[in-house]
């Protein structure tokens, strides 16, 4: 299917009468199968007028001289055609051009013009330029257009478009933890503009250009990451085109969020962008509220024609109410009203996160480019209130007090070299780099006296009851952890022929960490043993493309995960090496209008740390901190991605994921996990579907509507059972659920309005953290966005 061409039209005027008498010509250019063609340049030689068709293939000439004219239509990939047009005085002449493709040249044109998501070359993860169809693993990209269409205000709403990626927990309302392929991505797998960021906050989406999700192992590029996949948020950059955009969102529960985006050139070599937003909202949960301020300024300097420097800032200030949901009684979620908040009314939290990054891109020549990237991030989160909702069998709960503070700084440096070269008929696409991170984290522990605030019954909680006064907490301990990371890697995508490609890479990683704890009462500092880990992370992928629209692939990669604890010889534990295998197929149909990706995977951790059965002298071990790398987990599954733009204005996305993650080998000693048990918080099935359509013609042109559906299957909350535990069963079964969202919108000139009703069936379910933070999902809500382009 042809979407964008540059054509050359020659217009020959046969008659010319009465120069002062004019009319109007309105027209549309479509392909032989009825699709509008944008970007067509139309020239009228007699009047020296030219115009370009818009996205709908439409054009308009005003004040055109009256008379009969012959138009010759000619362009690469089309048969030459002629048409006669008569322009009458003060009248509008409506015409439609249907261009027939030239079969001799059409084949090549389709490849260049109609690009499917599988074939579109993307610069992903801050520099890796590659077509998804050439990658031996799964990649999904959610662009700003989809984010805007779906009115996403949280990253958790964006990832609803990605199969197998879901919110595993939302502990206390402070953050959202994302899971993929049975693994928690939150600790090390979340990036922004290619830099690892702290996952202790809820990221802002107002500045996002796209969200990239690379499924499977990414240790080759990033070192220590969980094997389920990595997520990278890419923010919008400065533009040398001047413009601005104001967006105001209002919705249920007093939600209000204006966002302003302004950009443009300062001169021929400097451009800027400033994105800012403010959010203020209450919640379907009584007392709970949130207030956020966000700033994202950026400047780009064109030092030379081949050199750019981008400086970007990112700042978020988030005031929020800690909310641990409803809690559980035994093996069941407590049946408390969805709106009931069980915490103290004075509970509060604050998160401040700021980043400054500098990125230098230098093009050495047409085939090679060099990137220098540097970033410093500061993170500060503090909250206090009642926590951990764990009532007894009749609902009585002694509300415990808690106060926590975390201060973190991450300094990151990256150097990447990317280029292409050939050896004979073999093409190489190389991506190599060196990276280093230094993370300093301080965790402050506070104590209350007494530790219990009061006692309530969760089924009969009255907000009007007078609460005890807010107690003061004393800082008792500060634990500081310093972690240094260094890695060097190289990757080569080798094109052996048009049908065969090989992706080979290797990374060496070094990681060093140490903790020291200051006990404030006696002013004593205890320093832990220094932990050092090194690991090689290889990657090998084979790609077979029997046709230009089919790609069969298989791959092997591994990753490493540092462990805590010591060996029986009082040494630090080695990192666990985790192996991952994938096979799959990527297929385009109907000239790229429909793309499908199917992936099968298996992830094996044969070095799972578990309590050692015996000590070095052969005696029975009772210290759970003494461990061996003798356990095993297996995660295996299937993922299906579907994407289609069957007609102009219609976008359809769908996905399905199956995952089975269990303990495949355990020691059986007291405290070890039970062999064959499924890991908690890992649903077997997830699915997603979205459809968005904008009318292209007629009186209702630019009217749009959409539907979004997301399914999370049955899963287990609580904790996994262990051998020798005193409690019969620590797991809590959680049912699956489906959520539907509907939206409708209209665009008129520079103004657009879009309204979304989310969770239209008012489904009730929960995101779960262990057994004490059961947070209900939001009920039916309405959100309206008003947007104006300057």
Give short role names for the model-derived ranges.
Residues 606, 652, 710-727, 745-790:
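C-terminal beta-signal and adjacent terminal beta-strands/loops
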Residues 356-379, 400-516, 597:
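Face-selective signature of the C-terminal outer-membrane beta-barrel domain
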Residues 628-720, 785-789:
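Gram-negative outer-membrane beta-barrel transporters
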Residues 35-38, 43-48, 62, 76, ...:
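Acidic, small-polar-rich N-terminal luminal/periplasmic segments of exported/outer-membrane proteins
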Residues 279, 283, 296-363, 376-408, ...:
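Acidic/polar loop-and-plug regions of large Gram-negative outer-membrane beta-barrel proteins
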Residues 304, 408, 427-429, 435-439, ...:
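Structural signature of Gram-negative outer-membrane beta-barrels, strongest in the C-terminal barrel
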Residues 207-209, 220-297, 303-307, 354, ...:
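Outer-membrane beta-barrel translocator/receptor signature
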Residues 363-365, 369-375, 379-385, 551, ...:
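Membrane-embedded beta-barrel scaffold of Gram-negative outer-membrane proteins
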């Amino acid at each position: 299917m042809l979407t964008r061409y540059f054509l050359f039209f020659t217009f020959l005027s046969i008659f010319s009468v009465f120069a002062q008498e004019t009319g109007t010509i309105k027209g549309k250019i479509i392909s032989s199968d009825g699709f509008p063609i944008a970007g067509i340049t139309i020239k009228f030689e007699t009047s020296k007028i030219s115009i370009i068709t818009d996205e709908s293939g439409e054009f308009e000439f005003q004040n055109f001289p009256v008379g009969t004219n012959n138009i010759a239509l000619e362009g690469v990939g089309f048969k030459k055609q002629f048409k006669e047009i008569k322009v009458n005085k003060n009248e509008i002449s409506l015409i439609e051009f249907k261009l027939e493709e030239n079969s001799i040249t059409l084949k090549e044109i389709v490849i260049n013009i109609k690009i499917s998501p599988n074939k579109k070359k993307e610069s992903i993860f801050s520099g890796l330029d590659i077509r998804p169809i050439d990658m031996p693993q799964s990649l999904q990209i959610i662009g700003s257009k989809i984010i805007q269409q779906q009115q996403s205000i949280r990253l958790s709403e964006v990832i609803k478009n990605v199969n197998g990626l879901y919110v595993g927990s939302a502990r206390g309302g402070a953050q959202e933890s994302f899971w993929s392929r049975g693994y928690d991505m939150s600790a090390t797998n979340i990036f922004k503009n290619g830099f690892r960021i702290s996952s202790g906050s809820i990221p802002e989406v107002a500045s996002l250009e796209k969200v990239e999700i690379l499924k499977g192992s990414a240790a080759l590029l990033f070192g220590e990451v969980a094997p389920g996949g990595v997520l990278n948020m890419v923010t919008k950059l400065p533009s040398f085109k001047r413009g601005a955009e104001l967006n105001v969102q209002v919705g249920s529960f007093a939600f209000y969020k204006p966002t302003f985006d302004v950009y443009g050139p300062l001169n021929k070599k400097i451009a800027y962008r400033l994105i800012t937003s403010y959010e203020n909202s209450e919640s379907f949960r009584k007392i709970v509220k949130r207030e956020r301020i966000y700033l994202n300024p950026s400047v780009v300097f064109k030092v030379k024609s081949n050199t750019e420097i981008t400086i970007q800032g990112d700042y978020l200030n988030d005031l929020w109410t800690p909310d641990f949901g409803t809690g559980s009684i035994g093996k069941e979620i407590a049946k408390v009203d969805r709106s009931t908040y069980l915490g103290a009314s004075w509970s509060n939290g604050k998160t401040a996160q700021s980043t400054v990054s500098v990125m230098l891109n230098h093009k050495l020549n047409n085939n090679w480019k060099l990137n220098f990237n540097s970033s410093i991030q500061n993170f500060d989160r503090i909250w206090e209130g009642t926590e951990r909702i764990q009532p007894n069998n009749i609902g009585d709960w002694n509300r415990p007090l808690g106060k926590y503070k975390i201060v973190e700084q991450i300094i990151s440096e990256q150097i990447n070299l990317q280029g292409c070269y050939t050896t004979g008929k073999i093409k190489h696409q190389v991506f190599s780099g060196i990276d280093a991170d230094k993370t300093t984290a301080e965790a402050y522990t506070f104590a209350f006296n007494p530790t219990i605030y009061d006692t309530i019954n969760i089924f009969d909680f009255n907000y009007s009851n007078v609460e005890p006064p807010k107690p003061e907490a004393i800082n008792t301990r500060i634990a500081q952890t310093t972690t240094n990371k260094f890695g060097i890697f190289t990757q080569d995508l080798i094109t052996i022929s048009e049908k065969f490609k090989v992706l080979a890479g290797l990374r060496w990683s070094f990681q060093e960490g140490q903790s020291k704890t200051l006990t404030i009462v006696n002013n004593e500092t205890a320093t832990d043993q220094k932990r050092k880990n090194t690991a090689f992370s290889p990657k090998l992928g084979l790609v077979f493309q029997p046709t230009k629209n089919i790609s069969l692939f298989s791959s092997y990669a591994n990753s490493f995960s540092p462990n805590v604890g010591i060996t029986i010889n009082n040494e630090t534990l080695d990192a666990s090496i985790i192996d991952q295998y994938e096979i799959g197929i990527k297929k385009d149909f109907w000239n790229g209008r429909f793309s499908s990706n199917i992936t099968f995977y298996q992830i094996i951790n044969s070095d799972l740390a578990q309590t050692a059965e015996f000590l070095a002298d052969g005696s029975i071990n009772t210290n759970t901190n003494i461990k061996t790398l003798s356990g095993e987990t297996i995660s295996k599954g299937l993922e299906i991605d579907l994407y289609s733009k069957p007609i102009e204005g219609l976008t359809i996305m769908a996905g399905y994921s199956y995952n089975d993650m269990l303990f495949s080998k355990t020691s059986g000693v007291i405290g070890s996990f039970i062999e064959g048990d499924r890991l908690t918080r890992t649903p077997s099935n997830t699915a997603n579907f979205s459809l968005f359509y904008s009318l292209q013609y007629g009186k209702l042109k630019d009217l749009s509507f959409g539907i979004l559906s997301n399914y999370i299957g049955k899963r287990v909350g609580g904790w996994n059972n262990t051998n020798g535990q005193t409690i019969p069963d620590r797991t809590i079964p959680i049912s699956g659920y489906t959520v539907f969202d509907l939206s409708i919108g209209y665009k008129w000139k520079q103004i657009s309005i879009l309204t979304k009703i989310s969770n239209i069936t008012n489904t009730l379910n929960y995101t779960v953290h262990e057994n004490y933070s059961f947070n209900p999902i939001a009920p039916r809500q309405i959100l309206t966005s008003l947007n104006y382009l300057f």
